[in-house]
């Protein structure tokens, strides 16, 4: 979208979920004198001062997924763009409920941080289970603050609830760590759901493995919304301060179509081969 509109991208950064690193990257990018900023704050408090420098310089800011702390929409920043985070959690709950026969005990392994996207996913999962599946009990909610500790968190969960039927994780990477821990104690029958489609998690869905399904944001759709929001910011066009794209449930039955819908490209060959092996 940005290329089509003739907008030059002067910097692309990836802080890899490290808020301190993100602050350094934001300050480096500011030195390039950009006309607008599109950014996702990993920690709303840690990054606040860095974003304030853009606001003080009257550089329009469009946030992705999460707004930094204490800023006012439409005044300090243009808008927040996001996928339907609550819907992601809802679909993950529906998929997990179906996979365990609509009864049993499940747990949540969630990202324990002030991060709107995952907070809403988790709320969507919890409220959907509690409202629509009376025979399913959420017996534990185990939080993590770093991907590196998910395995340890999962080990503790399984030690306390060795016969649990299913686990929801805030996204697919911690879900794979949960699966690794479950395999280590012989729980290949455990059902796991989450959000997002990485190559590993997509393969597991196609292979009818322990990751039985996920909800997936439509990345192409979300990217277009972000691009147009940034363009509107550059020309001073007023837009809604919250822009949301759609999501979809993904299971074995639709994983190939869903992957293309989400990312705009065909699923990797390995995923196709795994899916075809079960036909």
Report residues per predicted region.
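A residue-level marker of the well-folded mature domains of exported/periplasmic proteins
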Residues: 1-279
């Amino acid at each position: 979208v940005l290329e089509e509109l003739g907008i030059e991208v002067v910097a692309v950064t990836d802080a890899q979920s490290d808020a301190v690193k993100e602050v350094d990257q934001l300050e480096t990018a500011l030195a390039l004198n950009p006309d607008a900023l599109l950014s996702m704050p990993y920690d709303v408090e840690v990054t606040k001062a860095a974003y304030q420098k853009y606001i003080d310089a009257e550089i329009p800011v469009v946030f992705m997924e999460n707004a930094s702390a204490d800023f006012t929409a439409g005044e300090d920043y243009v808008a927040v763009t996001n996928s339907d985070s609550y819907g992601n959690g809802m679909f993950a709950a529906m998929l997990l409920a179906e996979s365990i026969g609509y009864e049993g005990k499940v747990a949540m392994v969630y990202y324990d941080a002030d991060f709107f996207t995952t907070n809403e996913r988790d709320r969507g999962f919890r409220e959907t289970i509690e409202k629509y599946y009376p025979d399913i009990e959420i017996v534990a909610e185990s939080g993590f603050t770093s991907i590196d500790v998910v395995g340890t968190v999962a080990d503790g969960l399984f030690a306390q609830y060795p016969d649990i039927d299913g686990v929801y994780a805030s996204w697919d990477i911690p879900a794979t760590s949960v699966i690794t821990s479950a395999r280590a104690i012989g729980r290949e029958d455990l059902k796991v759901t989450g959000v997002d489609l990485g190559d590993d998690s997509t393969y597991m869905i196609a292979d009818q493995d322990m990751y039985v399904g996920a909800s997936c944001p439509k990345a192409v759709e979300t990217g277009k919304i972000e691009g147009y929001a940034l363009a509107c910011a550059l020309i001073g066009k007023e837009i809604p301060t919250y822009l949301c794209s759609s999501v979809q449930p993904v299971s074995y039955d639709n994983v190939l179509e869903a992957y293309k819908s989400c990312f705009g490209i065909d699923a990797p060959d390995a995923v196709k081969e795994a899916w075809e092996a079960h036909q």
